[in-house]
Amino acid sequence: DSKSFFYSKLDKFHRPRQIYKHVVGTPIDSDKLIFEEKDETFTCGISLSTDEKFFIISSSDHITVEEYFFPSDTKSIKPVLFQKRKKNVRYSLDSWKEYFYIQTNEDARDYKILRCKINDINKLEEFIPPKKETVIGGLEFLDNFIVRSEKSDAIHKIFVRDIKTNQEEEIKISEEAIGIPGASLMQKDRNTSKIRVGWESMKTPGKVYEYDILTK
């Protein structure tokens, strides 16, 4: 609402374990505590989902994650638990249009992607299944496409999925497929078919390509 913001407060050991809401122009002692992590081995933080519809609170230690969410347009803040923490299970929640997307290592050592309708978080479906000896990376959302990455045998690959057809294909920047040790996506405008891909190999200096998904 441009009138307030959230911040985390450190405990005596300088670990963020509380999240407050501050309204600009009001005294700090009137700030509202919206979340507190009771477990001293966990820390917490807050972020905005890709579509900016939800704030997501993430509480974690080095091996376990638990996340909460609440609508960004609400005045009555009541964080909702997405999935109760399970030892050694990490997950990351994001939202895009009518879905929550979840990157998780539960029953998938190298991660997988699940999704569910925003209004039915208990009905999860597999979006990107786990692959043997392949690390499944995160997602980048455009209005008509979903871009994702994966890594196997030290080679990074980038895939584009058409949201309407659900068809997916790999982006190939170069025939030099023996090594793509670093690939990144940089995107601000979601209403586009163009993405920027950072690419380099053992014998090719780093470059940034603009890639049009429609014209290739």
Predicted regions and their residues:
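Peripheral, non-catalytic segments that deliver or gate enzyme domains
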Residues: 1-216
